[in-house]
């Protein structure tokens, strides 16, 4: 399984923490970094090198489909460009604001094939507007694109970056969340849904217990949250909920672990000696 990220240099510091956490908890074949052509991220390469994991830098080509979009929208589609991997294999795409806190061995063996080449997590709460305008099976069938597991060959036969961009342009009235909506629409009924522990969004955190979506009366999937917390593997600091922006009194162990890794980034060679999350919590 290859670890895959797509970003520009504005997110390099976040991605360095993310990569360190993933490589601490799982052995990947390589780290693949997709960026604009003039944004080679040397610090990320140093982090991967510290773990003795090869890095492949993939600059976005000038003829990429995302260049059809206004410049301010193009960064949202870096992740879509990254889904086009020419080397056959299993890839785990992750956003730069994610954090791995457990082993990912179960993702290595999860069946992916021509019928379901992509696996992702539901938002974990009803999204009736998205299901209606995108033709999804239910209000829970809208997935978050911050963590995507896919087979590169099978996915390429189903969807291309050009198709996602074209859908986003032609269905702009329906795509509230741009690339995420377009991808949901194009691969609907072909997604294998993962449990929430592989993409714990900010609203799902225990500190958000007062959120209405934690109430089973408003959200049937709220009953799953205790199991998600117990089996937690990937945290997504979505909606800007990065530990540096959250008051310390609200920090949970995963926030403090993120900060520990962040503070160690000045010396990449030291990163492999840092404890995994479960050991650090003892």
What positions do the PLM features span?
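Short, P/G- and charge-enriched loop/turn segments at secondary-structure junctions
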Residues: 69, 132-138, 220-224
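GT-A fold catalytic core of metal-dependent nucleotide-sugar glycosyltransferases
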Residues: 59, 75-127, 149-150
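A recurrent flexible, glycine/aromatic-enriched loop bordering the glycosyltransferase active site
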Residues: 136-147
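Glycine-rich phosphate-binding "P-loop"
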Residues: 1-11, 64-68
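Active-site-proximal specificity loops/subdomain of glycosyltransferases
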Residues: 40-86
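A glycosyltransferase accessory/donor-loop signature
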Residues: 4-7, 17, 152-282
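Short, acidic, metal-binding catalytic loop of nucleotide-sugar glycosyltransferases
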Residues: 21-29
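Short internal beta-strands
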Residues: 31-37, 120
